[in-house]
From Swiss-Prot:
Cofactor binding remark: Binds 1 zinc ion.
UniProt-listed SMART domains: SprT (SM00731)
Source organism per UniProt: Erwinia tasmaniensis (strain DSM 17950 / CFBP 7177 / CIP 109463 / NCPPB 4357 / Et1/99)
Record protein name field: Protein SprT
Keyword flag Cytoplasm: yes
Cofactor(s) for this UniProt protein: Zn(2+)
Length: 170
């Protein structure tokens, strides 16, 4: 899979938002937290992740390209808040009261835990499986475990083993 190329103007807009919110937080918290490293290598359906020990933010390049302004407005401060909470409070719940306070009171933004971006372009391939009562979709990882004989999955509703293939109504 080839990496997405982020236009320079978009990278600059991301950095501007990051620096604005970091400066705002440093003023309100009376601290001088350093600028985190920023990387565009988040994969899957997550818009971004905050890496606490390495003080870095990883952003999903596909979702950034598809949702530019909303991504910059919401995801960049969201991940920055995780880093700031870790520095300010230590180890706490990821979206707990400290994170909510950081988002709302310090950064002045709504504390939303998840994004609402369309994820069809970043969703992993799934494989059809069936049981006695319905159709199921297994992730690539789970499908490969079945193929290698490492795992067997059962339907939570009827309890029968899942088998590859489409469900046929009788």
């Amino acid at each position: 899979m080839k990496p997405e190329r982020i236009p320079i103007c978009l990278q600059q807009a991301v950095m501007l938002r990051l620096r604005e919110k970091l400066q705002q937080a440093n003023l309100r918290l009376e601290r001088n937290y350093p600028e985190p490293a920023l990387h565009y290598r988040q994969r899957g359906t997550a818009a971004g992740t905050a890496w606490l020990q390495s003080w870095e933010i990883r952003l999903n390049p596909v979702l950034l390209l598809e949702n530019q302004q909303a991504f910059i407005d919401e995801v960049v401060p969201h991940e920055l808040a995780h880093l700031l909470v870790w520095k300010h409070f230590g180890r706490v719940a990821p979206h707990g009261k400290e994170w909510k306070w950081m988002m709302e009171s310090v950064l002045g933004l709504p504390a939303r835990r998840t994004h609402q971006f369309a994820i069809a372009s970043v969703r992993s391939r799934t494989f059809p499986y069936r049981c006695g009562c319905q159709q199921h979709q297994l992730s690539v990882r789970r499908h490969n475990r079945v193929v290698r004989g490492e795992s067997e999955y059962r339907c939570l509703h009827c309890g029968t083993s899942l088998r590859p293939g489409e469900f046929q109504k009788s």
